[in-house]
Amino acid sequence: AYALAQRGVAVTVLEAGKAAQAASGNRQGLLYAKIAAHPTAQTKLLLAGYGYSRQLLDLTLPESHGWHACGVLHLNHNASEERRNQQLAQQHPHSTLYQAVNAAEASALAGVPISHSGLWWPHGAWLHPPAWVNALLAHPHIRLVEYARVEDVERHHNHWQLSYRQHGHAHILAASHVVLCGGAASAHLPLLHGWPFQPIRGQTSTARTGVLAQQLRCAL
């Protein structure tokens, strides 16, 4: 929506609930690229997206308003992660994006004792995802309609017609183009019946902070 709005396109966002909920509503997020140890098309896409996202974050959200350019330290918490990160570290073309660090170097970067080696992403960042989502949606060319559950999308002559329900009332919206961003929830739309959606459950945990957590100088 923001990319289209930046190009002068008037955008209407139909949000099933309130903006920046579900995965976008996580209290904390880390910006880095979880890439494979060997070059793939997905790796290229992820690295391009990582660089673009980092630049966009700089441009659209003041650092004091929900993010911190502190770097991300990806620790080798098991043998599989250690092998993968060692292979990544040997890819010299990406040495400016990340580098391998031993436990002592990791401890110096983090500001607390670390017993694992890892991969250091100096341009990585910690962020509060809802703050960024709401900043992007605040663009003057974007109209946000919350609690609007889309029930059907149909093509009518030279435009698309979206049927949605908001607070118990039925509404219809006409649009020249439609971008579906509902993830696995899009499967309920008749237009997408039969598409191979695969819901993947995510989970985050929270814990009380201690003295060491308050001394951290980077994201782990």
Which residues does each predicted region cover?
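Flavin-dependent oxidoreductases
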Residues: 44, 165-220
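Short glycine-/acidic-enriched loop or helix-start segments at secondary-structure transitions
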Residues: 23, 84-85, 189-191
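Dinucleotide-binding Rossmann-like beta1-alpha1 core, especially the glycine-rich loop
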Residues: 28-109
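Helical element adjacent to the flavin cofactor pocket in flavoenzyme catalytic cores
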Residues: 119-173, 177, 181
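Glycine-rich FAD pyrophosphate-binding loop
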Residues: 5-25
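Hydrophobic anchor at the start of a short beta-strand
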Residues: 11, 98, 178
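Glycine-rich nucleotide phosphate-binding loop and flanking beta-alpha elements
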Residues: 81, 152, 185-187
